[in-house]
Amino acid sequence: MEPLFFIGFVVIIIVILVAGYISSLKRREAMAAVAAKLGMQFMPNKDRYMARRYNFLDKLRRGSNRYAYNVLSGTYQGHEILIFDYHYKTGSGKNTHHYYFSFFILQLPASFPELIICPEGIFSKIAQAVGYDDIDFESHEFSRKFCVRSPNKKFAYDVCNARMIEYLLSSVRSPKDNTDLSIEIEERALAISFNSCLAPDKIEPNLNRLITVRSLLPDYLFTRR
């Protein structure tokens, strides 16, 4: 009985590995098709430099064994864009956990202090890593549904203006959107991210969400510097 059990166990492991490989290959092909549609370059291989280049962004400096993959890069609607799947791990041995998610970066023409906007609940996981309090707003609904943190409150209020607040609230009210959208701004990067890898057909719609967020940043943030 034991040899049969062992053989069955090995077969199950092989099936899981093969299924994982096929799934990764299909995603790679689908992401390549998205890149072609958007007129962007596509690099499927692991990119550890990306993690080092943007390690000032909170979500990209967590854990260990950090790398980007399925990287789309290029210009979209006049903005320099990076889109990629991302991985990091925490713990070791039996307590090892792997995290995979989608990340979008738009290059800004000026440098800014750190600002993080996350749906309430998601931010609690990283609250201890950020040494400043949640910022409150006149919109009680926005303050209930989002955590906003920055060492520069004036900058946070400038970014979270009335139009931005309404847009973000509409995103959590709409079931068709990914409601786990998080926003980070620091240095010259405007980033949005999610808690998992988006389906390839969700990449373009969420790239357009990134462009919308950029359009809601007040012009004076760039002209007065």
What are the residue ranges of the model-derived segments?
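Feature marks short, highly hydrophobic, charge-poor N-terminal signal-anchor/signal peptide-like helices
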Residues: M1-V10
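Transmembrane-cytosolic junction motif
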Residues: V15-L38
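Charged, low-complexity intrinsically disordered regions
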Residues: A30-K46, M50-R52, L57-R225
